[in-house]
């Protein structure tokens, strides 16, 4: 299937949709289940159970006026375990508890609809962990620091992953509910208000997203969709790989990309460790993500950035090339060779920059990074048992 056909197909939306007549539509993709009940929480803490309609390809759905904006709900799998919505927009408590019906149109963006962003060459990024950047560890408390960023000459802040994770403390890389900001940090409205206020001060806001694995606790996709959502052909450092050869799995992540960019007005995304995204499809999921984002959002600047330790240059912008591309990627070579140069460390992946092992001084690799982008452009990597690593980066734009 070609990319053009992928972009025009009809697909199902994950999660809840508020219908014009006030009813709520609930969709759940649960190919491992035989029967699903929607469980709506009542004032007395009990649940009203409504059997969902079975549809093709493992989908279950129901339209009902028994739920409203703010209602808490869960899904009961085969008359047994109750799970949150994998596409929950907000959790009542933690990842094991009920999801909340959210009105995506409720927030007043005011003049932010006129925000066009900033070009990539103006990006001066400041990375933030929401939980540790301030004493309060919230979206609201970051908002109070925006003038500080402006005074430094910062033009963009990048939030480390905020997708809902178990407990109250996490770096963000164990998220399991990818559409729900962790409620330890604040509500969806408070995150949107942070972004709106940042834009008023001329600051872009980026989000770090993790599409290579789910955290080990609270990942209820293992209950409802394990046979289709994950696959054992490829193994990642964090367990079974995500099955990006499945059409609905691809849709889940593409919808998540557009969700953050469109509903939250983020200016860009940083895709974590894409070298651990395994996809043998004719069109790689990374290509489809960037093509769909460019097709869908044309009225403002959006920027998509990769972390890719494999040094694959084909996803990045080339000189005199107008195809869909990612603006840039984190240069792990630069970090590693500078670290080796300063500390002399030569264990793990630092051995690839060690003079003792490579017969080249770390400064050689640093100079190559500064001149050409990647230090490794197909040379054998000692850390990877002398398997070649990287692609030619000489024809990338300077800003990549």
Language-model segments: residues:
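Substrate-binding/active-site clefts of carbohydrate-active enzymes
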Residues: 92, 113-120, 129-298, 303, ...
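Conserved alpha/beta catalytic core and glycan-binding cleft of carbohydrate-active enzymes
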Residues: 286, 290-400
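Beta-strand signatures of extracellular beta-sandwich domains
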Residues: 37-39
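Core domains of carbohydrate- and sulfate-ester-processing enzymes
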Residues: 77-113, 201, 219-226, 231-233, ...
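Residues at the C-termini of beta-strands that transition into short coil/loop
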Residues: 42, 182, 308
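Short proline/glycine-enriched turn/loop motifs at strand-loop junctions of beta-rich domains
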Residues: 29-35, 68
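Generic secondary-structure boundary/loop-capping signal
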Residues: 11, 49, 97-98, 104-106, ...
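The feature marks proteins involved in alpha-glucan
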Residues: 1-25, 44-127, 134-137
């Amino acid at each position: 299937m070609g990319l053009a056909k992928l972009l025009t197909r009809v697909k199902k939306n994950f999660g809840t949709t508020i219908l014009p007549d006030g009813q709520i539509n609930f969709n759940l993709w649960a190919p491992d289940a035989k029967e699903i009940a929607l469980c709506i929480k009542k004032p007395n803490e009990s649940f009203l159970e409504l059997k969902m309609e079975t549809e093709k390809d493992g989908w279950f759905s129901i339209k009902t006026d028994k739920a409203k904006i703010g209602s808490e709900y869960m899904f009961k799998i085969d008359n047994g375990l109750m799970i949150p919505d994998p596409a929950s927009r907000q959790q009542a408590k933690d990842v094991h508890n009920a999801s909340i019906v959210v009105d995506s149109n409720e927030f007043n963006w005011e003049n932010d609809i006129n925000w066009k962003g900033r070009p990539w060459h103006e990006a001066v990024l400041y990375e933030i962990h929401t939980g540790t950047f301030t004493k309060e560890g919230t979206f609201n408390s970051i908002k109070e620091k925006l003038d500080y960023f402006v005074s430094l000459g910062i033009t963009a802040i990048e939030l480390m992953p905020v997708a809902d994770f178990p407990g109250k403390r996490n770096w963000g890389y164990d998220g399991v509910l990818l559409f729900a900001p962790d409620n330890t940090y604040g509500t969806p409205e408070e995150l949107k208000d942070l972004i709106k206020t940042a834009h008023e001060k001329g600051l872009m806001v980026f989000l770090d997203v993790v599409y290579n694995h789910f955290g080990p606790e609270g990942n209820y996709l293992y209950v409802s969709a394990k046979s289709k959502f994950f696959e054992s052909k490829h193994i990642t450092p964090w367990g079974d790989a995500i099955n990006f050869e499945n059409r609905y799995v691809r849709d889940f992540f593409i919808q998540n990309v557009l969700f953050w960019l469109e509903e939250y007005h983020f200016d860009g995304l940083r895709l974590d460790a894409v070298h651990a995204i395994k996809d043998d499809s004719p069109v790689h999921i990374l290509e489809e993500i960037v093509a769909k984002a460019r097709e869908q959002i044309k009225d403002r600047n959006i920027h998509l950035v990769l972390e890719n330790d494999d040094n694959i240059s084909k996803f990045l912008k080339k000189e005199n090339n107008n195809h869909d591309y990612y603006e840039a990627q984190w240069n792990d070579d630069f970090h590693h060779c500078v670290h080796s140069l300063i500390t002399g460390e030569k264990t793990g992946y630092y051995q690839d920059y060690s003079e003792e092992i490579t017969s080249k001084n770390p400064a050689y690799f640093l100079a190559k990074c500064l001149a050409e982008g990647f230090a490794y452009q197909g040379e054998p990597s000692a850390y990877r048992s002398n398997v070649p690593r990287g692609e030619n980066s000489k024809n990338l734009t300077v800003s990549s």
